[in-house]
Amino acid sequence: MKQIAGGVTAAKGYEAASTAAGIKYQNRTDMAMIYSQVPCVAAGTFTTNVVKAAPVKWDQQVVKSGAKVQAVIVNSGIANACTGSEGFGYCKDTADAAAAALGISAAGVLVGSTGVIGKQIPIEKLTAGVAELAKKKQATLESGQEAAKAIMTTDTKEKELAVEIEVAGKTVTIGGMAKGSGMIHPNMCTMLAFITTDAVISKETLQKALSEDVDDTYNMISVDGDTSTNDTVLLLANGMAENEEIIYGSEAYETFTEALHVINEYLAKKIAGDGEGATALFEVKAVGCESKEQAKILAKSIVCSNLTKTAIAGHDANWGRILCAMGYSGAQFDPEQVDLFFESAAGKIQIIENGTAVNYSEAEATKILSEPEVTAIADVKMGEETATAWGCDLTHGYIEINADYRS
């Protein structure tokens, strides 16, 4: 496996574009297109929130139908959530506009939206934007990067990655882009991720690969405990690498899923670290657990604790908050057996041993917790299973961003 430059246009046959449609934002791009030169099989995972945005419902329908997909249209600024039949109709209007502009079937157009909930999309601006995107689409790495920028809302930076693998002597590429900064919580978190590959793989196998990996990547991040109405991860495969078909359970499948995991974990961590107002990526490793489920519950509980997140913001080794979060998680463990460590680029320090504080240096702990990426390692000494969750610190900036988000 090799990391390469680019994102959604790194794989063969994919083009992208961005444009400023003026949907909410002024003087910046707010629409993006991903286009495949040939039809793709598609897989998707979506929010578990009962309140689902219109694009989520549309995409679920398209993915379930088995239709070959050739384009994805995404807008930022307005989420098209809680907009009723009118909002769902705008998804169809978007697909129809893309079909007309690109000469493809509307049944194979996926859509995505992110932004303010409850507002109707200005559909005339959206369809005009689709026509512009169709004219501007290119296969360059730069067009992929600009597409990643166009889907940002409160994000501070674009998020993209691409890797290459070998499958039976053929080079297969996987590339992705994502957005997400707030309303991020495990269970498909407002986050959107779009992944493209030129692999030859069936729709069923592609869906298994995505579904199996989401639990260990996007579902292990949290910024604020709010599960969005719009969470969507879409994975397209156009087969242009001309590799021998990747079969579920084969060695090639293992290679493919390892590469997919690299993409998903990278994007998930970038979302977590770019949380609204955040100054640090906060990683939590639960180790020495008796089951994977126990490890995930403990890691998630710590990373979601607002008191712990504010301690990280203050570079304060307030370990009692972590032990407390473990205690109310629902997982069973012996608190008098827990060891806790903090780690960053500045070093590693043990804070508690067997549930009580060791004689550590507060100054050294503060130095370690002052880095832009900080890890807490909780060892319950019950087994060999581990899990990792990602979040961020909680600062005044989060309140400032969200107090006036609609304006």
Where are these regions (language model features)?
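A structural signal for small-residue-enriched, beta-sheet-centric alpha/beta enzyme cores
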Residues: 1-75, 79-93, 99-407
